[in-house]
Amino acid sequence: MSRELVLGMGLPAELRAALERAGERVVPETREEMLELAMGGKDDCFEVAYDVAERGRVVEATVVRCRNGVVVNYPEAYMRRRDPNCMFIGDEAATDKPRLRDEFPVEMETLRGEVFDWLGQQDLIVMPFMVGDDRLGYPGLLVAPKNAGFFAGGLADLQGFGPASAVPADYTPRAIIYLAPTFRHTHFGGRQVVVHQRSEALHEVFAFNLYPGPSAKKGVYGILLDIGEQEGWVTAHASTVRVVTPYDNTLTIMHEGASGGGKSEMIEQIHREPDGRIKLATNLETGDEIRLHLTETSELQPVTDDMALCHPALQSGTRRLVVADAEEGWFLRINHIRQYGTDPHHERLCVHPPEGLIFMNLEGAPGSTCLIWEHTMDAPGVPCPNPRVIMPRRFVPGVVNGAAEVDVRSFGVRTPPCTAAHPSYGIIGMLHVLPASLAWLWRLVAP
C-alpha cells in the first residue's frame, strides 16, 4: 500500500527516483503509530543515531518513553534551541535573507542531488501534512529517515497530518520538507542549517538538523509567508485570545511580536502569588515589587498561539481583521515553570494529557511521569533555557475552533531596561496606542 500510494503522488522526478531506491517507506496511519515510530519500536529508550563519514556513529538525539508521552533530548547543548542564523535561501528569487552560496562553498543543485542520494539509501517516513489550517491550508509532505519518528510526530502535532487511508491517489504537495541530519556534519561543520528553495509551484525546505524549531515550526511559517506573498495575504506572527469578562462582555485581542514579545503569555492563565496577588513588575534599580489585587478574572479562550492566518477568504467585510489558527498544535516553551505550582493550567495538561505528548529538553526516565519543571541541564547547575512541549490544540480546554474577528490589536517588543544612567530603546514603555493604519510601522521590527 505504502509503495503504491507514495509513487502515485505528484512529486519531483528526483524525489520519486529516491523513493523508488529507498528501503522501507512508511506512511503513518495514526498518531499512536507515530509515537511508536518515535521510539523505534516497543523499547522504552531509543537512540536516534547515524553513521557519518569520518566520524562513525553519531547519536543526534535520545528518546525515552514516559507515562505521559515521549521525552526527546539532544546530547549537544547547541542542538537544544534554534540557531537564529540557521536559515538560508537556495534559490535566486528576491530575498532579504542570506543565501546559501554566500555562506557555504556548495551549489544548491549539487546539494539537492546529494540529499536525494542519501534519502534513497534510507528507510523512510513519508508523511502528508497540512501547511496552514485544514480548510484553507496547502498540502505538504515530509520525507525523513524512519528513525526520526519523533520529528515526524512533532510536525504532525504542529500542523496536522493526513492518515495514509485518507490520502488521495493524486496527492500533489505544495511544499516538501526533506530531513537529512547527517549533512550537518558532512557539509556544514556541525551547524544548524535549513535551506528554502522556492518556486511558483513548490516550496522545498531542506532541514539538516533534528531540532524541529527551524523547520517543522519556523520552516512551515516561512512556507506560509512565501505562499501569502505570491497570493497577496499574510500569516501574522501573533497570538489571539477571546476574553470573556465576569460580566459576559467579549473582546478578542491579537498580539503580534517577535520571540519574547509576550505572545504565548496572552493565552495563559495569569500567575498568582501564594496570597492570590499578582506580581506586575520589579523595579530593577530599587528592587521594589509592584503587586496587583484582582479578585475577578476573565475567561480566556485561545484562538492562536503563534501563527494567525489572515486569509482573504476569512474576511467578513466589517473592516475588522478575521484570523484563524495556522497550526494544529503549539510549540510551548516552559522555561518559566521551575517548580510545582507555577502554572497549574499547563502542569495539569502536561502531567495528565488525553494522549501522550512530545517533550523536549526535559528530564525523563523510562516509565516515569515527565515533570515540566525538571529541565535538562546544559551544564551543572545551568538548566536549558528552552524546554518545550508540543501541545495539540484539541487538548486545550476552551480553545476556539474556527475564525475569530479581532477587536484590539497589540504589538509586543522585547527591550532592554531603560534608565537615566543607561538609556535605551526600552523607552517605548509598556503601552502605546496607535491607529490600525500605522500597524505596519511596528511590524517592521517583527521577524
List the predicted regions and their residue ranges.
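Long, basic/Gly/Ser/Thr-rich N-terminal segments
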Residues: M1-P214
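Flexible loop/turn segments at secondary-structure boundaries
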Residues: R135, G213, G261-S264, P274-G276, ...
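Short acidic, glycine/serine/threonine-rich loops at helix termini
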Residues: G137-V143, I267-E268, A313-G317, H336
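N-terminal pre-Walker A segment at the start of P-loop NTPase domains
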Residues: G213-P246
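Glycine-rich phosphate-binding P-loop
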Residues: D248-K279
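Conserved nucleotide-sensing/catalytic segment adjacent to the nucleotide-binding pocket
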Residues: K279, L284-M377
